[in-house]
Amino acid sequence: MGLSVVILAAGKGSRMNSNKPKVLQTLAAKTLIEHVVSSVEKLNPDNIVVVTGHLKEQVEDALQGRNITFVYQQQQLGTGHAVLQALPYLKEQKVLILYGDVPLISTEVLENLVDTTNYDDLGVLTAFVENPQGLGRIVRDKFGAVTEIVEEKDANDIQRQIKEINTGIYCVHKNLLQKWLPEIKANNVQKEYYLTDIITFAKADHVSINVTHPINEFEILGVNDRTQLASLERVWQRNVAEKIMAKGVSIADPNRFDVRGNLDVGKDCWIDINVIIKGNVKLGNNVVIGANCILKNCIIEDNVRIKSNSMVDGSIIREGAIVGPFARVRPECDVKEGAVIGNFVEAKKTILGKGSKASHLTYLGDSEIGANCNIGAGVITCNYDGVNKHKTVIGDYAFIGSDSQLIAPVNIGQGATVGAGSTIVKDVPADNLAISRARQRHIDTWQRSVKKTDK
């Protein structure tokens, strides 16, 4: 089955009050038009044509690297005029026409429209909605056949009562478009060339009109302002949350959970409120994610606990490990089985060995820490000399006392102990105690200063 796709994306979207085109507003961290393109790409069309207009360079940059032909509509003269600009770039086959600001349209709905529309038919996707205000109405004759689509600005009082609306999504052969598009006239209030006029031409030419409907009403909702954008964001997120819960994951409040990428989940996980997923994230079984956590491009293995207000980015947290609360795991970390990254601990480009613990107030950067180590409160691996980063290596079973600074590059041997408050600048041999601090003195003649008082 041959198929071409036309996506109309020339609109300015003035109600957005934005410096970028409407189709480049984001929903779930993807632009509106990227959502649409992703849905149609799954149909494996022969070509995709995007009709641009306002700030066309921005739209082209956003879709760079995809197999798309861009066509510029210099004057905004309506949807019929927009499709006419794309006509020379279409193959002699079925053409699917849709909009770049309808982000939740599913591949399944589009596929049904294409599959049920014969080569000599006109396929129209319509929907029944409770509030059709602002939308084009589907007018039918007494036999139920579609006769025309009337835009609200051109509709009479009776037509405005109609609940069946035009979604603006069509499937029609290029040969019919070549005949009909030049015949469209701007005989309307807006003085624009409406694509909806092809319904009238189809009736006149005795072309069958195939009508299909979406699975869910939200799939055909467009975005014209930021209020509608926020509303569709919640619809999208709720839909994603329900799919995740169906896989065996408990979400404390689906209305306070955001996926801005892809989430692969195991079973019996628990996700608390205000958790944000970014990029590609994988959760194992029995994972617990506390409130207000952000997970980005990471792997969380079985039985891990990510406590509240923690961030994990570009890292792997191994089975049974604990992160947080208030912890930050930056890219290229590997937190091994049963290890602990505790409260107010930051780690970057660090391996924390199996069973090792950094429980509080610590910075671990460019570090390789062995198994069963204890990293005390306030420990800092000083990895930056002002120009280059250097590595700290800590052997198995080492004990690093609180408030110690390890000046990289430095090696702490297996089983070594660093006394609290030390500044370590040289390698520490295995099983040695290293202390580097001033000797404690008691000055019995010292007197505390007394606050002066005005006389």
UniProtKB/Swiss-Prot annotation:
PANTHER family: BIFUNCTIONAL PROTEIN GLMU, NUCLEOTIDYL TRANSFERASE. In the N-terminal section; belongs to the N-acetylglucosamine-1-phosphate uridyltransferase family. Residues 227-247 are annotated as: Linker. Keywords: Acyltransferase, Cell shape, Cell wall biogenesis/degradation, Cytoplasm, Magnesium, Metal-binding, Multifunctional enzyme, Nucleotidyltransferase, Peptidoglycan synthesis, Repeat, Transferase. Its EC number is 2.7.7.23, 2.3.1.157. Pathway: Nucleotide-sugar biosynthesis; UDP-N-acetyl-alpha-D-glucosamine biosynthesis; N-acetyl-alpha-D-glucosamine 1-phosphate from alpha-D-glucosamine 6-phosphate (route II): step 2/2; Nucleotide-sugar biosynthesis; UDP-N-acetyl-alpha-D-glucosamine biosynthesis; UDP-N-acetyl-alpha-D-glucosamine from N-acetyl-alpha-D-glucosamine 1-phosphate: step 1/1; Bacterial outer membrane biogenesis; LPS lipid A biosynthesis. It catalyses: alpha-D-glucosamine 1-phosphate + acetyl-CoA = N-acetyl-alpha-D-glucosamine 1-phosphate + CoA + H(+); N-acetyl-alpha-D-glucosamine 1-phosphate + UTP + H(+) = UDP-N-acetyl-alpha-D-glucosamine + diphosphate. Its main location: cytoplasm. The active site is at residue 360. The keyword RNA-binding does not apply. This is Bifunctional protein GlmU. The gene is glmU. Catalyzes the last two sequential reactions in the de novo biosynthetic pathway for UDP-N-acetylglucosamine (UDP-GlcNAc). The C-terminal domain catalyzes the transfer of acetyl group from acetyl coenzyme A to glucosamine-1-phosphate (GlcN-1-P) to produce N-acetylglucosamine-1-phosphate (GlcNAc-1-P), which is converted into UDP-GlcNAc by the transfer of uridine 5-monophosphate (from uridine 5-triphosphate), a reaction catalyzed by the N-terminal domain. UDP-N-acetyl-alpha-D-glucosamine binds at residues 8-11, 22, 73, 78-79, 99-101, 136, 151, 166, 224, 330, 348, 363, 374. It is an enzyme of class 2 (transferase). One of its GO terms (molecular function) is glucosamine-1-phosphate N-acetyltransferase activity. Residues 248-455 are annotated as: N-acetyltransferase. Pfam families: Hexapep (PF00132), NTP_transf_3 (PF12804). One of its GO terms (cellular component) is cytoplasm. Its cofactor is Mg(2+). Mg(2+) binds at residues 101, 224. One of its GO terms (biological process) is regulation of cell shape. Acetyl-CoA binds at residues 377, 383-384, 402, 420, 437.
